């Protein structure tokens, strides 16, 4: 059996779809953790819990990390996975991942933004945990999150850091993967992530401060892993997140000057050593922006990030209109 942990907060419009996708997975138990919802979601959770395979936990509002921790505490099956209340598991995701997991302690499926994605050739790659961690640190937005992961409960003794607000799932996944021996990566469509505009309003200062707090919390694990190049890439990808979701905003000439000044200070004060590791021949758009930052081309980097922000916002609008 697999426990599916669903942290829930004010998800009245989306929860039933998420739960339906979970029930279709077969031999599963669903743990709904209501984090102090105020819109009728708590009552809906109680109604859904009449199903024999659904249990509900109610708690005061303490944030998604506390809700996930409550789910971890209640989990009792050999395997577990997480599902956000506004996303869905794709058909046969759990069964396909279990069939490919073998002796691995964790397996990652594909995350899509479509409920009817192209079907890839079903293959699996098994990696030593250190190789997987190297890959994950270099690509944290792809690998260091809870979406699409199926985990043996025996490796999930770590708890989410409830003081973190941004990037907390990646910091937790890094600690969990540290305790594995082998990890599998499967070419299996597993999880549909419904891209939405963030309902929480964060100021630029809040975004920078919260991501820096996450990096501080992650540093002991990074020190333990002793992967300096991969750790630098992990931190630099968080720098790009800070800039994209916090510092860089639309605005006029004076706004641009002020933002470029903030970018320069952040790069010089917190990321100078990491930027020195950036390759001179970038292999991706993200690496190209990091090279601009290394070279002090802050206006050019800001422009590239603005383009990326506009693409993200358009994707959010398209996703919302499709629902």
Locate predicted features:
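Short, acidic, metal-binding catalytic loop of nucleotide-sugar glycosyltransferases
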Residues: 20-29
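Short aromatic/hydrophobic "clamp" motif used to bind/position activated sugar donors
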Residues: 80
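Membrane-interface aromatic/basic loop that binds lipid-linked glycans or pyrophosphate carriers
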Residues: 249-323
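Catalytic core of nucleotide-sugar-dependent glycosyltransferases
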Residues: 189-197, 202-230, 249-271
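A conserved acidic beta->alpha catalytic loop
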Residues: 21, 34-43, 60
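Glycine-rich, basic loop-to-helix element that forms the pyrophosphate-binding segment
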Residues: 59-75
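Conserved nucleotide-sugar donor-binding catalytic segment
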Residues: 132-206
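Conserved donor NDP-sugar-binding/catalytic core segment of glycosyltransferases
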Residues: 92-121
């Amino acid at each position: 059996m697999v426990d599916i942990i669903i942290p829930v907060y004010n998800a009245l419009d989306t929860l039933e779809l998420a739960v339906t996708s979970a029930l279709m997975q077969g031999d599963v138990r669903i743990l709904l953790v209501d984090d102090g919802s105020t819109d009728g979601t708590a009552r809906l959770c109680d109604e859904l819990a009449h199903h024999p395979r659904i249990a509900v936990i109610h708690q005061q509002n303490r944030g998604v990390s506390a809700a996930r921790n409550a789910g971890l505490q209640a989990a009792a099956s050999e395997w577990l996975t997480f599902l956000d209340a506004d996303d869905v598991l794709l058909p046969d995701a759990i069964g396909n991942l279990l069939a490919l997991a073998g002796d691995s302690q964790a397996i990652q499926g594909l995350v899509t933004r479509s409920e009817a994605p192209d079907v890839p050739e079903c293959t699996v790659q098994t990696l030593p945990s250190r190789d997987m961690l190297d890959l994950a640190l270099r690509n944290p937005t792809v690998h260091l999150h809870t979406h699409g992961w199926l985990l043996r409960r025996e490796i999930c003794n770590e708890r989410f850091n409830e003081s973190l607000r941004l990037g907390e799932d990646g910091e937790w996944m890094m600690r969990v993967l540290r305790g594995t021996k082998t990890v599998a990566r499967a070419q299996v469509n597993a999880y549909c992530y419904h891209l939405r505009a963030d309902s929480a309003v964060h100021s630029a200062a809040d975004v920078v401060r919260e991501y820096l707090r996450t990096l501080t919390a992650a540093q002991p694990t990074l020190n333990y892993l002793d992967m300096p190049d991969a750790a630098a890439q992990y931190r630099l990808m968080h720098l790009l997140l800070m800039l994209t979701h916090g510092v860089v905003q639309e605005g006029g000439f004076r706004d641009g000057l002020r933002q470029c000044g903030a970018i320069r200070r952040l790069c010089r004060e917190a990321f100078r050593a990491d930027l020195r590791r950036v390759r001179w021949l970038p292999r991706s758009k993200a690496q190209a922006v990091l090279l601009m930052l290394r070279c002090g081309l802050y206006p050019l980097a800001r422009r590239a990030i603005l383009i990326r922000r506009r693409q993200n916002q358009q994707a959010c609008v398209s996703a919302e209109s499709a629902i």
